[in-house]
Each structure stands twice: as structure tokens, then as C-alpha cells.
């Protein structure tokens, strides 16, 4: 009497299961994140560590620098995040939240790794980019006022010399 053990199909199934078992961990370990995916994970980490009331969402990601092919090597990143309307206490993805009007904007720099198994990042963010924006607005307004004043002075000088020029009557 012939049993299933004696048949060739058991050997094939055993080999198939062995190969499947060996390749599955490699697929999980070897997953390489895209540059943007790694940054989004870093933003999630920042939200978890943050003591602010609301979640932050990626606002702008600076262009990807040229990188080597090793996903374990830390890659430099630079991006801005903006405060959303979602409280940090809810379990929601920041991408599902709207930006808060006049919300806090933070500029962040650091490094991320693209290897999902390592999933490491070292990011630091400035406290308030709005102060820089306000200073820029003040400087722009001051420049406009100074420019307007110089334009008036220039017109007066032009008028003065225009009056001094000899006039010829016809």
C-alpha cells in the first residue's frame, strides 16, 4: 500500500514551504521606504514626542539630495510641518487633518534611514517660524516706505533741475 509520504508531492510541498519561509523574512526586513515615506514616519514620530496640543502635518518637503544606495545609511532631510486642527489625543493620521488657520509652522532638519526595519530618524525642529515670517513682513513694509520716500525725493530733484534748464521761446 502506497502512502502520501512515498509520493513526490510531499517533497515538493516541503521544499516550497521551506523556500517560502526563508523568503518571507527577507521581504519584511528588506523593505526600503521612499524618501517621502521615511519623512512621513519621522513626522509621525515628532507628533508622538510633541507636547503641543495639536498634530503637525507635512507642509513642504525640500528636494531630495543625491544619496547613496544604502538604505541603512542616514539620509539628510529638510522639511516644514504645520499645525493642524486635530488634537494630538485622537488616533488619526495627520494627512486626514486640515491645517489650522494661522497655525504654527516648524522648520525641521535631520536624518532618516530608508530601511523600514531600522525605521530610525534624528530630527530637530525650530520653535516658531512665524516670528521669521513676521520679521520678513516688517522688513518688506519698511523697504516699501523707504522706496516710496526715495522715489518722491528723486522726483523733486528731477523737477528742480528741470526748472533750472534754460528755456527757449519760439
From Swiss-Prot:
In this chain, the stretch annotated as Active core covers 150-162
Q: Which InterPro entries match?
A: Cathelicidin-like, Cathelicidin_CS, Cathlecidin_C, Cystatin_sf
Cellular location(s): Secreted; Vesicle
One protein family per Pfam = Cathelicidins
Coiled-coil residue spans? none
Task: Look up the record and report any one GO term of the cellular component aspect.
Answer: extracellular space
Care to name a GO molecular-function term for this sequence? lipopolysaccharide binding
Keyword Transmembrane in annotation: no
Q: Where is the signal peptide?
A: 1-30
Task: Identify the keywords attached in UniProt to this record, alphabetized.
Answer: Antibiotic, Antimicrobial, Cleavage on pair of basic residues, Disulfide bond, Immunity, Innate immunity, Secreted, Signal
State if Disulfide bond is listed as a keyword.
Answer: yes
Query: Which residue numbers fall in the propeptide?
Result: 31-131
Q: List the disulfide bonds.
A: 86-97, 108-125
Record note on modification: Proteolytically cleaved by proteinase PRTN3 into antibacterial peptide LL-37. Proteolytically cleaved by cathepsin CTSG and neutrophil elastase ELANE. After secretion onto the skin surface, the CAMP gene product is processed by a serine protease-dependent mechanism into multiple novel antimicrobial peptides distinct from and shorter than cathelicidin LL-37. These peptides show enhanced antimicrobial action, acquiring the ability to kill skin pathogens such as S.aureus, E.coli and C.albicans. These peptides have lost the ability to stimulate CXCL8/IL8 release from keratinocytes. The peptides act synergistically, killing bacteria at lower concentrations when present together, and maintain activity at increased salt condition.
Q: Which GO terms describe its biological process?
A: antimicrobial humoral immune response mediated by antimicrobial peptide; defense response to Gram-negative bacterium; defense response to Gram-positive bacterium; innate immune response; neutrophil activation
Identify the stretch(es) annotated as Cathelin-like domain (CLD). Answer: 31-131
Family recorded in the similarity comment: Belongs to the cathelicidin family.
Domain topic, free-text comment: The cathelin-like domain (CLD), which is the propeptide part, does not seem to exhibit auto-inhibitory function, as it does not inhibit the antibacterial activity of antibacterial peptide LL-37.
Describe its function: Antimicrobial protein that is an integral component of the innate immune system. Binds to bacterial lipopolysaccharides (LPS). Acts via neutrophil N-formyl peptide receptors to enhance the release of CXCL2. Postsecretory processing generates multiple cathelicidin antimicrobial peptides with various lengths which act as a topical antimicrobial defense in sweat on skin. The unprocessed precursor form, cathelicidin antimicrobial peptide, inhibits the growth of Gram-negative E.coli and E.aerogenes with efficiencies comparable to that of the mature peptide LL-37 (in vitro).
Q: What name has this protein been given in UniProt?
A: Cathelicidin antimicrobial peptide
Q: Species lineage, top-down?
A: Eukaryota, Metazoa, Chordata, Craniata, Vertebrata
Q: Which gene encodes it?
A: CAMP
Amino acid at each position: 500500500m502506497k502512502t502520501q509520504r512515498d509520493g513526490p508531492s510531499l517533497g515538493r510541498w516541503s521544499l516550497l514551504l521551506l523556500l517560502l519561509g526563508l523568503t518571507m523574512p527577507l521581504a519584511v526586513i528588506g523593505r526600503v521606504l521612499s524618501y517621502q515615506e521615511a519623512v512621513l514616519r519621522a513626522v509621525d514620530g515628532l507628533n508622538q514626542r510633541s507636547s503641543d496640543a495639536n498634530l503637525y502635518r507635512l507642509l513642504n518637503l525640500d528636494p531630495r539630495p543625491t544619496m547613496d544606495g544604502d538604505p541603512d545609511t542616514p539620509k539628510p532631510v529638510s522639511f516644514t510641518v504645520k499645525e493642524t486642527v486635530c488634537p494630538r489625543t485622537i488616533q488619526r493620521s495627520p494627512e486626514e487633518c486640515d491645517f489650522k488657520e494661522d497655525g504654527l509652522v516648524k522648520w525641521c532638519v535631520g536624518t532618516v534611514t530608508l530601511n523600514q526595519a531600522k525605521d530610525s530618524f534624528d530630527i530637530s525642529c525650530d520653535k516658531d517660524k512665524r516670528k521669521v515670517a513676521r520679521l520678513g513682513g516688517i522688513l518688506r513694509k519698511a523697504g516699501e516706505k523707504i522706496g516710496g520716500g526715495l522715489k518722491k525725493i528723486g522726483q523733486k530733484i528731477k523737477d528742480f533741475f528741470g526748472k533750472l534748464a534754460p528755456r527757449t521761446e519760439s
